[in-house]
A protein has these predicted regions:
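Auxiliary Fe-S-binding modules of radical SAM enzymes
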Residues: 31-34, 110-170
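Conserved Radical SAM active-site core
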Residues: 1-79
Length: 170
């Protein structure tokens, strides 16, 4: 995958990915007993997803996308839209996708006021503590505790964890 932001905490390996045709991807997908597909990492909107998305929808798949929101998502094919803006790192980047199902913000201590104009377009609000692979368990734990305290003080937000990182899976 590729991304137009490349945040330092991202778990996407931008150097190792393989281009495949829709047929090759569908062959791989059909080998699994699953009907839920998530387009993610880096920034999926930089790719031409629509031929694959149309094929998946035709075959009965539920489609979700996680995007940084800098590119508008066409209506009609995606069932669940998660926007994860990076305003805290890139304050001058314009968010083009201002509606969706889920607003997920990586929390690094920024004021939640910055999301006021944006959060009205979403039905679910999530704060995710920033997990730093180079930090100690204690440092990451402090980030988690800070995020948890902010969520408790702002009950319209929910806590979101990247459990795979905490477990050392990726």
């Amino acid at each position: 995958g590729n991304c137009n932001l490349r945040c330092e905490w991202c778990d996407t390996n931008f150097d190792e990915y393989e281009q495949k045709s829709v047929d090759e991807i569908m062959q791989e997908i059909n080998s699994y007993d699953c009907k839920n597909i998530v387009f993610t990492g880096g920034e999926p909107m930089l790719n031409d997803l629509w031929p694959l998305a149309r094929t998946l929808k035709h075959d009965g798949y539920h489609l979700s996308i996680e995007s940084n929101g800098t590119i508008a998502i066409p209506e009609g094919l995606i069932d669940w839209i998660c926007i994860s803006p990076k305003d805290q790192m890139y304050p001058n980047v314009s968010i083009k996708q201002r509606t969706g199902d889920e607003l997920k913000c990586v929390y690094v201590g920024q004021s939640l006021d910055m999301y006021e104009p944006l959060k009205q377009g979403f039905s679910h609000l999530f704060l995710q503590p920033c997990y730093d692979e180079n930090a100690t368990v204690e440092e990451n734990g402090r980030g988690f505790a800070l995020t948890e305290a902010v969520v408790k003080a702002h009950p319209e937000w929910r806590l979101s964890l990247q459990t795979h990182k905490w477990m050392g899976i990726l």
